[in-house]
Amino acid sequence: MLKRTYKDTGLEISTLGLGCMRLPKVSTEGEEIDFEKAQEIVDYAYANGINYYDTAYIYHGGQSEEFIGGALKKYPRDTYNLVTKMPIWRVEKKEDVEQIFNEQLKNCQVEYFDFYLCHAINEDNFKQYIEYGAYEFLSKMKEEGKIRYLGFSFHDKPHVMENVCDTYKWDFAQIQLNYLDWEMQDAKRQYEILEERGIPCIVMEPVRGGVLANPCEASNELFKEARPDKSIASWAIRYAASLPNVLTVLSGMSNLDQIKDNVETMTHFEPLTEKD
């Protein structure tokens, strides 16, 4: 598994991260996790060098944190990076930030989070993050060793990102980035803003929720003609991972076939060429 060093810390992060928003479910209706099948995915990920596991308070109706904390419990704590996020829309008063954070530690059965994010920042809710002192509290948790690195995930326009980046000091940021959204959702400019400020980039939605695994018949034919031995999804993963300021690419893998394909892509990683 290809790894990249986080800043100058010496910490090596797998370039493929396991996103825990689309784990196997017991049925197509609802969000209940199929714990047995999901555990198989986590075990395969760990065995193949994935050491970055991204969850959130709200994923799978609140089950995701509890699941991934339990799934990783059998492995040495210093061999993986556990990541979760603060849902500011669940906060009604300052005290709620601390209450939710402590609940997350309990959910995940850990004493600290390796990477922690202010979740889904946009122009409107950034005011709430400021009002409720979320950054200040989370910075205190960082000082106490309960958070190693503090960042944010983002869903808005580039000028909003510039304001967010310049208001506080961030260790990393997570954005939606893929070859469709590079222009359409301003991912290019968002990526540049982070790169200009020396903020490492975590990529979410590299395959755009599966859309880029089967974009259209004409595109599929071009991909298969160029590399008949590679999956169509692998092109999207490689696109994101080829950018120099990307630390890891998150993929929500809901079955073993998907994770095997992505692991193969990142174990024998080939950056995109000009011809590609």
Task: Name the predicted role of every residue range.
Residues 59, 75-94, 119:
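Structural motif corresponding to the early beta-alpha repeats
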Residues 52-59, 148-152, 174-175, 248-250:
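Short catalytic-loop micro-motif centered on adjacent basic/acidic residues
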Residues 1-80, 143:
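N-terminal binding-site loop/beta-alpha segment at the start of enzyme catalytic domains
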